[in-house]
Swiss-Prot record:
The respiratory membrane-bound nitrate reductase enzyme complex plays a role in generation of metabolic energy by using nitrate as a terminal electron acceptor during anaerobic conditions. May transfer electrons to the iron-sulfur centers of the catalytic beta subunit. This is Putative respiratory nitrate reductase heme subunit ORF7. It comes from Haloferax mediterranei (strain ATCC 33500 / DSM 1411 / JCM 8866 / NBRC 14739 / NCIMB 2177 / R-4). Probable multiprotein complex; a catalytic heterodimer of an alpha and beta chain is proposed to associate with additional subunits involved in membrane attachment and electron transfer. Its cofactor is heme b. One of its GO terms (molecular function) is metal ion binding.
């Protein structure tokens, strides 16, 4: 074999190696990729007690790290909030939806014993009409939202809102909350029946993706009312198929194309040198 042929054979072998590495890396990513801003809903068994924050049922449920930012507000120091990331998991049985929230908080603020003291709190927001996305700041009169609002003093409220300052409490909350605080971290599970025929109460039984947003208050940092950490819209994939771009696949595809591009440039350089 000539020296020129040896160089070409080496270049081809390099490309083959690159493609094998690419397929090994991209294959699993393409299989596990999910649409952007999706909170996967995993099926679990009711007997595994998913309502408990420390249940082993949650070990097999994918978690999403949701970035949090200060909510726009005219309150003093409204931009000075402390919760930057919320870990979210979601599961369902045949009858109920479970949403598990977990975040770092150095103090468990459960009681108010004096002025200027506030309890920790968290909220889950979903639209009443699951086919249309409402304004993220508490919905609107035409497209209201349900808010599941938990306070560390033990209270869970189910609210209806049609815009900022319009919240009204359901006469009886259908939302149940279980909580755990350990090693500087809150973990709570909020759950509700999937189906609901009640007026102005979200039903998860339809074949529609359901938008969802989150909020967290750190009581020891004077966070209350509009001073809170909030997310952008995410969604539960209850619909018939993927919605939105599979961002993980896109990232891996870009990386793969870059590898192939480098390999092609290498081949051209080898061929050029071989012809000199």
């Amino acid at each position: 074999m000539s020296k020129k042929s040896e160089k070409r054979a080496t270049a081809v072998a390099a490309v083959v190696v690159c493609l094998v590495v690419l397929l090994t890396a991209v294959g699993p990513a393409m299989v596990t990729a999910r649409p952007a801003n999706e909170i996967p809903v995993e099926s679990v068994l009711a007997e595994d007690q998913p309502q408990q924050p420390t249940s082993e049922a949650w070990n097999s449920v994918p978690a999403v790290e949701v970035p949090m930012a200060s909510a726009p507000s005219g309150l003093p120091n409204a931009s000075d909030t402390s919760i930057e990331t919320l870990r979210v998991q979601s599961a369902r049985t045949e009858e109920r939806l479970y949403v598990r929230l977990s975040w770092a908080d150095g103090t468990a603020d459960r009681n108010i014993s004096g002025p200027q003291q506030f309890v920790d709190a968290a909220a889950v927001q979903v639209p009443v009409n699951t086919t249309a996305r409402p304004p993220i700041s508490m919905g609107s009169t035409r497209n209201p939202v349900n808010v599941w609002y938990w306070r560390a003093d033990g209270e869970t409220e189910e609210l209806l809102a049609g815009g900022p300052g319009t919240t009204t409490k359901f006469e009886q909350s259908a939302v149940e909350t279980k909580t755990a605080y350990d090693d500087g971290r809150w973990t709570i599970v909020m759950s509700r029946e999937l189906n609901s025929d009640a007026e102005n109460r979200t039903s998860f039984a339809a074949n529609d993706d359901v938008d969802v947003a989150f909020a967290v208050w750190n009581g020891s940092q004077m966070e209350r009312s509009g001073r809170k950490s909030v997310s952008e819209w995410y969604h539960f994939p209850f619909g018939p198929g993927p919605q939105g771009p599979p961002y993980e696949s896109i990232l891996w595809t870009v990386a793969g194309l870059a590898i192939v591009g480098v390999a092609l440039v290498t081949i051209q350089a080898v061929q050029k040198n071989g012809g000199d």
